[in-house]
Amino acid sequence: QISGPSAAVMYWNQREKSRHTFMGEWTRSGDKYTRDADGYYHYCGRSDDMLKVSGIYVSPFEVEGALMTHEAVLEAAVVAHADTDQLIKPKAWVVLKPGLAASDALADQLKQHVKDKLAPYKYPRWLEFVAELPKTATGKIQRFKLRG
């Protein structure tokens, strides 16, 4: 929750959304942060983008960041995806650097790369190679199109 003189007070003509978002002087932003041992805050994404895998929250940004450290990856996006048992797991869309070709072997290598960087439950169970990620005019990834 946040508060301050620049915070909005309501959504225009959206009473129910306003009621759930604005509580007196406080605004429930939907942004998730962690605080490190030195007191610094680190942005982890939106609460509606967070994945709950095996009962533990996973930031898609964290998985994307791990994928981005691989030499073949130009861009990555991660969203929640249900497996055959309807359990939520990470699914990744990856744009490769120019001149590189997608393959099952590379997909397996990228999954292992994430396992080596993060806790094993965070690795993407599915990985799709795409030419580009869907984005807004300002360059933000349109995750809702990937969930679709």
Identify the meaning behind each predicted range:
Residues 127-130:
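General small-molecule cofactor/ligand-binding pocket signal
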